[in-house]
Amino acid sequence: MAAKDIRFGEDARTRMVRGVNVLANAVKATLGPKGRNVVLEKSFGAPTITKDGVSVAKEIELADKFENMGAQMVKEVASKTNDNAGDGTTTATVLAQALIREGAKAVAAGMNPMDLKRGIDQAVKAAVVELKNISKPTTDDKAIAQVGTISANSDESIGNIIAEAMKKVGKEGVITVEEGSGLENELDVVEGMQFDRGYLSPYFINNQQSQSADLDDPFILLHDKKISNVRDLLPVLEGVAKAGKPLLIVAEEVEGEALATLVVNTIRGIVKVVAVKAPGFGDRRKAMLEDMAVLTGGTVISEEVGLALEKATIKDLGRAKKVQVSKENTTIIDGAGDSAAIESRVGQIKTQIEDTSSDYDREKLQERVAKLAGGVAVIKVGASTEIEMKEKKARVEDALHATRAAVEEGVVPGGGVALVRALVAVGDLKGANEDQTHGIQIALRAMEAPLREIVANAGEEPSVILNKVKEGTGNYGYNAANGEFGDMVEFGILDPTKVTRSALQNAASIAGLMITTEAMVADAPKKDEPALPAGGGMGGMGGMDF
């Protein structure tokens, strides 16, 4: 086992705080409307330019192992806040730095670290309650657009396109972000349920212009096995032909004689049919077929529940207003399912989302909720260069997370004002002893740090602006973008409550751990091995002729 280098007490904390400061100073330069860019070197290709706090934090590794431990712990604050709320990483880092720096000074002055931690926790708990009190629900599109704009570094076009996307697919709908091919941002909305499977034969195409198969008011057959024998399909085909309606078949596979018969019937105009493969694999395929059954009011024809295809009737089929099938996608629009059954199914999937620990499963389950609840919107990010595209896409994703958080827990006045209002409300707190009270004071001073940093990045004097904001009440604050004081809500400067709350709680959590650290252990640096002596020539070789 390698030898270890161990540091204790003040020496350990000093090095750790040094690492915290290096990382936090790089990250906090990006805070606020006048925050600066940070350039990140890449191992290949052009460097990345970003104003995204978590992107900066992730790139930082320090040479000194003890300093690096401090930096990595603050990096954890940024990452955790990003995971919880999707934004607020820079605010969390600024709060953590302020808490750790003041806490380390207090410990050096001889105060009890555990009491300091208890005091900080007490203040944060009270501040979170106050944040919830001043929070307002987000209901209108304007507020959603404002939250998105602030999170995207005051880019109104991003805030507006996110608000439009949410309006079209609902607050539960899936909104994805992709790299576009143009210069402007574009919004592409897919209504109804879409899955990534297209027609099994080009002979099903009936719309030559769009090269798709369009079915109006069709019946929908859902089957979880292969269909290769046309005799199994005859009862359903006869029923559909009598009703004079088209038919969409979604099955594991339609092949051989069955597929050939369907193609011939379609070409001759006897019955309009389109066959597609079921989406997904294994259990996910079964679940998605069930979703389709609920959406269309049909039944999945499955031997597992005692239903055989040859016994299926027209009553087992689902219905929809319209179905569009292209080469790669199938879209079911306005299914005839019972709305109560759809809501129940959505609730069931949401429970699974809460229970799952896999990010991949969570993403797929959320997609299923969206497909049942309203549709999918795709924001295509436009930019003139690849570097700008990457930076802009990261900002759009941040803004999207922030707006979701705002819908979930409401909004508070932005620009660091909410934390200033919370600290004024909990300023009378007292701890069980002097050290705990000092811990409370540390937390209250730290809650001023985001506003101070926003003002400093705007080139103004933080203390002067902070005192003026403290003199005001409610939403009164400082707009760093134009240097005006006024109502932050009217200025459109809003932060999601969840983002501010998560930033404060995560910063306090890591700061508490770091203040109470008494020893640090790292691998000792390896000493360079002594070099081998230089080899000399062989003796006794003189005078030889070659």
Swiss-Prot record:
It catalyses: ATP + H2O + a folded polypeptide = ADP + phosphate + an unfolded polypeptide. It comes from the Bacteria. It is an enzyme of class 5 (isomerase). Signal peptide: none annotated. SUPFAM superfamilies: GroEL apical domain-like, GroEL equatorial domain-like, GroEL-intermediate domain like. Its EC number is 5.6.1.7. PROSITE patterns: CHAPERONINS_CPN60 (PS00296). ATP binds at residues 30-33, 51, 87-91, 415, 479-481, 495. This is Chaperonin GroEL. It comes from Xanthomonas axonopodis pv. citri (strain 306). The gene is groEL.
